[in-house]
Every structure is written in C-alpha cells, then in structure tokens.
Swiss-Prot record:
Function: Possesses intrinsic ATP-dependent nucleosome-remodeling activity. Constitutes the catalytic subunit of several complexes capable of forming ordered nucleosome arrays on chromatin. Involved in the formation of nucleosome distribution patterns. Required for the maintenance of the plant vegetative phase. In association with RLT1 or RLT2 may prevent the early activation of the vegetative-to-reproductive transition by regulating key genes that contribute to flower timing, such as FT, SEP1, SEP3, AGL8/FUL, SOC1 and FLC. Necessary to acquire heat stress (HS) memory.
Coiled coil regions in record: none
Comp. bias regions, Basic residues: 146-156
A GO cellular component entry from the record: nucleus
GO biological process, one term: positive regulation of cellular response to heat
UniProt-listed Enzyme Commission number(s): 3.6.4.-
Cited Pfam families: HAND, Helicase_C, SLIDE, SNF2-rel_dom
PANTHER family assigned: CHROMODOMAIN-HELICASE-DNA-BINDING PROTEIN 3-RELATED-RELATED, SWI_SNF-RELATED MATRIX-ASSOCIATED ACTIN-DEPENDENT REGULATOR OF CHROMATIN SUBFAMILY A MEMBER 5
Positions of short motif DEAH box: 322-325
Organism of this sequence: Arabidopsis thaliana (Mouse-ear cress)
Bias-annotated ranges (Basic and acidic residues): 1-10, 79-93, 1059-1069
UniProt entry tagged with the keyword ATP-binding: yes
Name the UniProt record assigns to this protein: ISWI chromatin-remodeling complex ATPase CHR17
Length: 1069
C-alpha cells in the first residue's frame, strides 16, 4: 500500500464534491444521449406511420365516409405527436450542448484555480534546492516587495495583526511542506509490474507535481519513459481523483505506440487519437473530443499546430511533449504554439542527452518556468565565462539549475537485468565496379579534393562517395537494364552485400531476428529486392510509410511465432518510438554523421523486454571515407560524455572543411593503386573475429583520446578532432601526385602537316601480337515512361535483339582467338535496315520531351478546363505550344489505358468535367431567369414557396443572383467583396459578416429554386404551345368571298399596303 501524507487525504476531501458534480454531469449527458437516440427512433417510427398510403384504390372498393374522417383525425393526431417529439428532441439537443459547455467551463475553472494555487510554493521549493534561483526570482519582485520606502522601524508600516498573520502562514507552509507523497507500490490501475527505477521515477514526477514544478524526463532510450508518464497520470486518477484532461504531443510515428501503451498499462484512462483528414478530425471534434468524454488527447506536432483553435478551448492538467528536443528553438512555430495552450503542468520527454548550449538550455527552462527564466540576456550574463578558471564553476552552476527539473538515468546504471549489448565493426573491401565509380568521383572534382573547393562541394563529394560504398546501383545507369532483374549481380557488385549475404544465413541458423538500418531509402529498395531473391520474409518502414501500415508492420513482426526474419528501417524514420525487442541483431548498413541517431536505432532492440544479448554489426568499407565517418562518430560520443563530465560549453556540432577534406582523401592511394576487387573469400566467423579485434583497437584509441582531451585546456583555436596521429601522417601524402599518376588522359585530336606513305605502311605491316578485341558498345535503351506513349513492347524486342547479337558476336570472336573451334555456333541475325528504321520511327513517335511534371500539369489542366478546351490547357503548360498539347491530347484520348493508374486519372478528369458541366448548367439557368426581366437588379423575384428563410431578405437574394451571373459561379471571394463594398448593405451587419461558405450555401439554395421555377415555366410554355396548336387544327379555314375572288392580284396588293399604312398611323398616334 502507498504511504500518503495527511495533506494528501485532505486534498482528496477538498475536491471530492467538485469531482462528484462533474461525474454526475457526465452521467446526465450520457443519459441524455440514450434518451435522444430513443426519441429519434420513436420519431422515425411515427413518421413512417404518418406517411400516406400510396397503394392505388380500386373503383369497386367502397370507403365509408366515417372511416375517412377517423383516419384523418388519427393522421392529424400522429402528425401533432411527431411535431412535438421533434421539438422536444431539438430542445434536448440544445440542453445537451449547454450541459457539455457547463462541464467544460467548470473543468477549465477548476484547472485555472489549481494553476493559481500551484505557483505559491514553487519559488520557495526552488530556493530550497539551490540559491541560484534567488538571482532570477529577484528580477520579478512580489507586490509586498514593491511597497514604498521609509525610514526607521516604521518604514514597512506593517501592523501587529498583519505580522502575526504572516507568521502563521509561514508556519503552516512549513508544516505542509514537511510531508510528501512517496509510493512504495505502484497504482492499482496500472497493469503489469513497474521496475524499481521506474517506481523511483514515478515518485520523482509526483514530487514535481506536489511542488508545482514542470520537469524533463530524460532517461536513456529503452528505460520505459512512456510507462512512467502513464503511471503519473494513473496516480492522479487513483489517488487525486484527477481524470484530466491531459494532452500528449508526439511525433506522428509514435502516436500508435502511445495509444497501445495506454490501453495496455492503464485501460481505465480514456484516450483519443486526434489525427486524420479534415472529415475524420471533424468527427473527432464533435463526438469524441468533448468535455467529460475523454481523459487523454494524443496528437502529433502537426495537428497541434493545425488544430490549435480546437485545443485551446480546453484548459489542460498536463501537456506532455515527447521528443522534446523539437522545441529547443523558442522561435519555431511548434514552440510558439505549445506556449499558447493553458495548462497546469508541462512535462518534456527526451531520450537524447542535453548539450550544454546556453541558449538551448534557456529555451527549455523558459518553457518550463517562464515566470522565472523570462530573459535570455539575464541568463547569458549570469553564466558568462570571464576566464578559463571559471569554466568548472559555470558548469557546476548549470547542473545546479537543471537538478530540480531533470532526471536522466542510463541503462548501465539502473537496468542490471537487461542483457548486454555488443557492437562489432565489420570491415569489407570494394568490388571492381565500386572502385571504378569511387575513382571516377575523385577524378571528377580534382580541384575540390586538392583543397580549393567550398565546404558545400566537399559535402556533396562525401555523400557521393558514401553512396558508392553502399552500392553502385544507387547511381543512375549503373544497374544493367531494362529489363531490370534480380540475381547474383545485386550481391557481387557491392562489398557490403557480399558481407550481408554471408552473415544472414548464419543468423538464420541460430534463430536470430534482424533489424537492418540505412539512411538511404533507395538502398532499402535494393535490400528489398535482395531479400525477395533469397526468399527471406521481411517488413519495411521508411519515411513514406503511413501510420496504419507502420503499426501493422510492427505488430506482424512482434507477434508470437512470427515468420518475419528481417525488418528494414530507415535510420531517421524508424529510429524513434518503435519497440522491436523481439529482434536480437541490429545491422547498421551505413553510419550516420550524428552518433545519437545510430544509438536510437540500436535501442529499438536493446530495451526493456529483451531476453537475448543484442549484437550490433556496423558495416564499414575499409580504406574509404566510411572508416573516418565511424571514427568521428566514436569521437563525438566520447566528447558528449566529456561535455557532461568536464563541462565543455562550446562543442563542435558540424564537420568542418578540413575534416571533410581528410575524410575524402582517406584511402585514395589504395583505391588508385589497384583496379581489382578487394573483397575477400574469408569465412564469416573469421570476418567477425577480425571485426572484434578492430573494434577493440578503436575502443582503446578512444580511451586514449578521452584521457588526452581531459588534460587538454580550453582553447578556441584548437580542434577536438585532432587527436589522431594517422591524420597527421595522412596530411603529408601528396594527393595530387597519386591522382596524376593514375590519371587516364582522354584521347587528343592531332593534325599532322606531312603525311608519309612509307611510315604508314611500316606501322600497318609491323609484326606483333594481335590486339585484344575491344568489347562492343552495348546500345542503351532510353528510359521510357508510360505517359510518354512509346511502343515499349516493340522497342524492347528490337533492343534485346540488337544486344543479343552484339554479345554473341563478341563471344564468338573471343572463342575464335583463344580456342580452335572447327565450326562455331551460328550467331543471331543483326537488325535489318527496316528494323533500324522502325526503331528510329518508334523513338520519334513518343513524347520524349514530356516529363512527369508536364504530364501532371496536363492532367490538372484537364480537370480544371475539360479535355476539349485545348487552348486553356495549353495556357497552363509551361514550355509547350498549343500544337504540341493538341497532339498529346489526341494520343491521350486513344491510349490513356496504357497508363499504370489510368482509372484514377480518368475518374479525376471526369469529376472535374462534371463540375464544369454543372457550372455551365447553373449559369444557363440564371441567365434564363434574368432574361425574363427588363431590369433584374430591381425587378427580379424568386418563388420561395413556403421555404423562405428568415435570415436573408429578398433584396439580398436578388443582389446575390445578379452578381453570380456577372462574376460567374464559384467566385465566392469576389461575391463576398461585392457585398462588403455595395452601398445597399452598408448597415447590414448580418450580410457583411457572412463567410464564403455560407454565401455559397445560400446561392446553391437559390439556384435550386430557380431551376425548379424554370422547369415549371418551360412546362407552361410547352402546354401553351400544345393548346395553341390544337385550337388552330380545330378552327375551320375561311374561304374568300366571290368579290375578292374576282379582284385582280394588283388591286389586292394595293389594299394590303393601304391597310398596313393605316395601321401604322394608328399605332403612331
């Protein structure tokens, strides 16, 4: 049982009534929800009963008049009941919203009151820890300290009663502060068993809570910081009766792990994951993220910024920020957003050690205690170094400042039962292809490598060299194809792949499970092809993996009896918030510049729950840049420890130009000295043994480096990374001489003034060994995309035929020169002249100048304007003429099914064309309506029927329809601006305050009314024409009289003219 102080019991009694009220309100809301559902069902059944019977009644059936009257009365009665129920339902909905708002207001008021109370003893607690806080606390004097000055003993003007009251308060504070809660057992609502150091961490968090202090939980990765945090919230729930609300803000990749851990360890706490598309977030806001319905809100950094308006409605008990190093910059958008939320406590969680950077430390302290650490200038002045002797004192002061807020423990110190971790560096040579690319990269930027380039260019060379060390297929065009095939060439062309191919079968035989980390996502693609080729089952996570897919992969790998052997992870995306303790081998295919990132990757397996010894194999290409990258990472780890122990305030964060130059030059002599592969055929056990020896040598070297660094004095001009004697010897190597000796000059064109026939025949007829036949130049098939509409199938056939012929012809020549064969095998036929011409025509038919960007722009333009509006589509295309776009559109119309995802593309285009068609229909309907009026701005009338609203008047609707006809449907911003600038609505606040969405909804309502009116008008016109036609056919035609028949045509014509003139005169009058 937990031993709590009396103060804890009294606090429970103090808030019990308030908590009961909140629970009762919540129960009432839930009862109202059930009642609303029942009412909705009953109202729906009433409406079904009230609905008129649509079955036809026969003429023979006789319905009594009395029965009709009774049925009418029943219908009226049911309609009245339904109407009352609907009104009651509406009233209950209103009451429900009011109750929820009351709960939220009560909750926020309670949290705000606690916020005001917790600050009273905070400074006093901090001053008890160290006197340093007095310096910062003095900068913000309390009101009692701001009283006017006087002289003598009457200067304070403090009465005897006031002095007694202050003394009583101090005594009470001393009594209350003397006790403190210390749990001896974990909260009962926590499932599972807390380890001793985790229980100690929980007690540390409770002590911070009781003293009103925010803190940083910075235990090493894998020690269960998530569980300790959940245990704190469980303690508040069980012992303090505080159910929240709390908010956890974490990287998007860790949200699934947070939700799983809360459900697993403390299922009594109701957690809501606030993430998703706008529709999903709207549902969460309205149904789940409601006061009284949740305890913990788990969301990502991006959602906290995007939905800050929603989250600011709540006052939070605890805001917990995972991976808190993201807010070390106080000017970042995330840091500014997190400071906007109202909260009682803030808890930061980080697994990376805090560097002694003064400004970053101040940013964290300012976030934790803004009223104390309010000024960065004051902080910097207080810890300013005036000399070398003050260095140690300043570091001690920094540690004193951090002590009340920070808890950091290492696995080696607290987790004695955790199996050890063993790291081995496995070195491997380079293949012939790797050496070829490595040499070409150095020769390409010879000026930069000689020391004349900028740091940025050196970084680019270093990145390219590291790609070459990983696999040459990372360079475009290195892999043979298309068609691209999986085979032994994936392994033999890279030294690390040869090493991996030897290592994995050994690990498979001993029932180990493997995590493979790499920084390069494209390398994971190559590893994925390799695993499929060898038949190993695997999972994969990189930066493009979605949250649901990520959780499913982790679950599939960790489930009991899983057959997944390998897990491929990118170092950056897969190194955070993932528990893969079911694996016992970690392979670092390449090393990160920052060693902390590699440690995070290793801790995915070396964490609580691991039952086997964890083996870490770090691959390294010997005599290349990677050896220096790994050595620098080891030195940086040693320096990080030195920062904490010795207090180095100015640590080196980025590699400088000289270091980069040494790394790039390292091993160049070995690379240029030989073209052959340096991959050995040694057994994997022998390779591991040599790796252990190399790792032990490096550890001894780092130990000496640390001892030298401890004795080294602080000097701004010195470099921490200059403790390696090899670097000094290497700087003496003439790199330019090495490259020049192995440089292959390109052939030069020579022009000779005199031509000698004798010399020509001498050289021609000179006897000697026959020259070795050169390998044929294999034609390379250009990269063809589906949207370029080439005839890929036929082109592939022609290229394969040409390549096959050239290779067979070359092999035949080699066999003829080396082996005497009577009748060599027949060689396939080369391309005929017709096939060569066909190939050239096929290459011209496609759209080789169209890129993926052009294609996407074409699709978007088709969605916007429709496929037939070529002129508008061409206006959206950069660098394409209207003729080119028209030609592409014609081919697209016929061959769009050749695209990989043509169904999705066509659906998007058809959806856009439907919007255009609907827009045209709307504009025609409005035009038809306005054509019936001489001045529609004044005369336009809309037939509302019985559905006329009370918010918008007829003048507003008339103006809206006329402006839409003028501006076009969909231009809602322009419509809103027209309402605001029109003098008609100068004093109409309602109309001027409408949003574009509200105006669009009103306009759609009016358009439906106009379309209905147009249909009725067309129907009346059609009926009138039909009746006129029928009346004409029913009236007999009049025959001319005899006198008219006898008159001549000329006289009749004169009479008609006279009548028309008379009629015109009458009309003029």
């Amino acid at each position: 049982m937990a031993r709590a102080s009396k103060r804890e019991v009294s606090s429970d009694e103090a808030y019990s009534s308030e908590e009961e009220e909140q629970v009762n309100d919540q129960a009432n809301v839930e009862e109202d929800d059930d009642e609303l559902e029942a009412v909705a069902r009953s109202a729906g059944s009433d409406e079904e009963d009230v609905a008129p019977d649509e079955a036809p009644v026969s003429d023979d059936e006789v319905v009594p008049v009395e029965d009709d009257a009774e049925e009418d009365e029943e219908d009226e009665e049911k309609a009245e009941i339904s109407k009352r129920e609907k009104a009651r339902l509406k009233e209950m909905q209103k009451m429900k919203k009011q109750k929820i708002q009351q709960i939220l207001d009560s909750q926020n008021a309670s949290i705000d009151a606690d916020m005001n109370n917790k600050g009273k003893g905070r400074i006093k607690y901090l001053l008890q820890q160290t006197e340093l806080f007095a310096h910062f606390a003095k900068s913000d004097p309390s009101p009692s300290q701001k009283k006017g000055k006087g002289r003598g003993r009457h200067s304070s003007k403090l009465t005897e009663e006031e002095e007694d009251e202050e003394c009583l308060k101090e005594e009470e504070g001393g009594i209350v502060g003397s006790g403190g809660t210390r749990l001896l057992t974990q909260p009962a609502c926590i499932q599972g068993k807390l380890r001793d150091y985790q229980l100690a961490g929980l007690n540390w968090l409770i002590r911070l809570y009781e003293n009103g202090i925010n803190g940083i939980l910075a235990d090493e990765m894998g020690l269960g910081k998530t569980l300790q945090t959940i245990s704190l919230l469980a303690y508040l729930h069980e012992y303090r009766g505080i159910n929240g609300p709390h908010m956890v803000v974490a990287p998007k990749s860790t949200l699934g792990n947070w939700m799983n851990e809360i459900r697993r360890f403390c299922p009594v706490l109701r957690a809501v994951k606030f993430l998703g598309n706008p529709e999903e977030r709207r549902h969460i806001r309205e149904e789940l993220l409601v006061a009284g319905k949740f305890d913990i809100c788990v969301t990502s950094f991006e959602m906290a910024i995007k939905e800050k308006t929603t989250l600011r409605r709540f006052s939070w008990r605890y805001i917990i920020i995972d991976e808190a190093h993201r807010i070390k910059n106080e000017n970042s958008l995330l840091s500014k957003t997190m400071r906007l939320f109202s909260t009682n406590y803030r808890l930061l969680i980080t697994g990376t050690p805090l560097q002694n950077n003064l400004h970053e430390l101040w940013a964290l302290l300012n976030f934790l205690l803004p009223e104390v650490f309010s000024s960065a200038e004051t902080f910097d002045e207080w810890f300013q170094i005036s000399g070398e002797n003050d260095q140690q004192e300043v570091v001690q002061q920094l540690h004193k400042v951090l002590r009340p807020f920070l808890l950091r423990r290492l696995k080696s110190d607290v987790e004695k039962g955790l199996p050890p971790k063993k790291e081995t560096i496995l070195k491997v040579g380079m293949s012939q292809m790797q050496k070829q690319y490595y040499k070409a990269l150095l020769q390409k930027d010879l000026e930069v490598v000689n020391g004349g380039g900028e740091r940025k260019r050196l970084l680019n060379i270093a990145m390219q060299l590291r790609k070459c060390c990983n696999h040459p297929y990372l360079f475009q065009g290195a892999e043979p194809g298309p068609p691209y095939t999986t085979g032994d060439h994936l392994v033999t062309n890279a030294g690390k792949m040869v090493l991996l191919d030897k290592l994995l079968p050994k690990l498979k035989d001993r029932d180990s499970r493997v995590l493979i980390f790499s920084q390069m996502t494209r390398l994971l693609d190559i590893l994925e092809d390799y695993l499929m080729y060898r038949g190993y089952q695997y999972c994969r996570i990189d930066g493009n993996t979605g949250g649901d897919e990520r959780d499913a992969s982790i679950e599939a790998y960790n489930k009991p009896g899983s057959e997944k052997f390998v897990f491929l992870l990118s170092t950056r995306a897969g190194g955070l918030g993932i528990n893969l303790a079911t694996a016992d081998v970690v392979i670092l295919y390449d090393s990160d510049w920052n060693p902390q990132v590699d440690l995070q990757a290793q801790d995915r397996a070396h964490r609580i729950g691991q039952k086997k010894e964890v083996q870490v194999f770090r691959f390294c290409t010997e005599n290349a840049i990677e050896a220096k990258v790994i050595e620098r990472a080891y030195k940086k780890l040693a320096l990080d420890a030195l920062v904490i122990q010795q207090g180095r305030l100015a640590e080196q964060k980025t590699v400088n130009k000289d270091e980069l130059l040494q790394m790039v030059r390292y091993g160049a002599e070995m690379v240029f000295s030989s073209k052959d592969s340096t991959i050995t055929d040694e057994d994997i056990d022998r390779i591991i043994a040599k790796g252990e020896e190399a790792t032990a040598e490096l550890d001894a070297k780092m130990k000496k480096f640390t001892e030298d660094a401890i004795q080294f004095k602080m000097d701004d001009s010195a470099d921490f990374y200059d403790f390696d004697d090899d670097n000094k010897d290497e700087s003496k190597v003439d790199f330019k001489k090495i490259v020049s000796e192995n440089w292959n000059d390109p052939p030069k064109r020579e022009r000779k003034r005199n031509y000698s026939e004798v010399e020509y025949f001498k050289q021609t007829l000179r006897q000697g060994a026959p020259a070795k036949p050169k390998e044929p130049r294999i034609p390379r098939m250009p990269q063809l995309h589906d949207f370029q509409f080439f005839n890929i199938q036929r082109l592939t056939e022609l290229y394969e035929k040409e390549v096959r012929y050239l290779m067979q012809a070359h092999q035949k020549t080699q066999m003829k020169d080396t082996i005497e064969v009577d009748e060599p095998e027949e060689v396939g036929d080369p391309l005929t002249a017709e096939e060569v011409e066909e190939k050239e025509l096929l290459l011209e038919e496609g759209f080789s100048t169209w890129s993926r960007r052009d294609f996407n722009a074409f699709i978007r333009a088709c969605e916007k304007y429709g496929r037939n509006d070529i002129k508008s589509i061409a206006s959206e295309m950069e660098g394409k003429t209207e003729e080119e776009v028209e030609r592409y559109a014609q081919v697209f119309q016929v061959r769009y099914k050749e695209l990989n995802d043509y169904d999705r593309i066509i659906k998007n285009i058809e959806r856009g064309e439907a919007r255009i068609s609907r827009k045209d229909e709307i504009m025609k309907a409005i035009g038809k309506k306005l054509d019936r009026y001489r001045n529609p701005w004044l005369e336009l009338k809309i037939q509302y029927g019985q559905n006329k609203g009370k918010l918008y008047n007829e003048e507003c609707d008339r103006f809206m329809i006329c402006m839409v006809h003028k501006l076009g449907y969909g231009n809602w911003d322009e419509l809103k601006a027209a309402f605001r600038t029109s003098p008609l609505f100068r004093f109409d606040w309602f109309v001027k305050s409408r949003t574009t969405q509200e105006l669009a909804r009103r306009c759609d309502t009016l358009i439906r009314l106009i379309e209905k009116e147009n249909q009725e008008f067309d129907e009346r016109e059609r009926q009138a024409r039909k009746e006129k036609k029928l009346s004409k056919s029913a009236t007999p035609s009049k025959r001319p009289s005899g006198r008219q028949a006898n008159e001549s045509p000329s006289s009749l014509l004169k009479k008609r003219k006279q009548l028309s003139m008379d009629d015109y005169g009458k009309r003029r009058k």
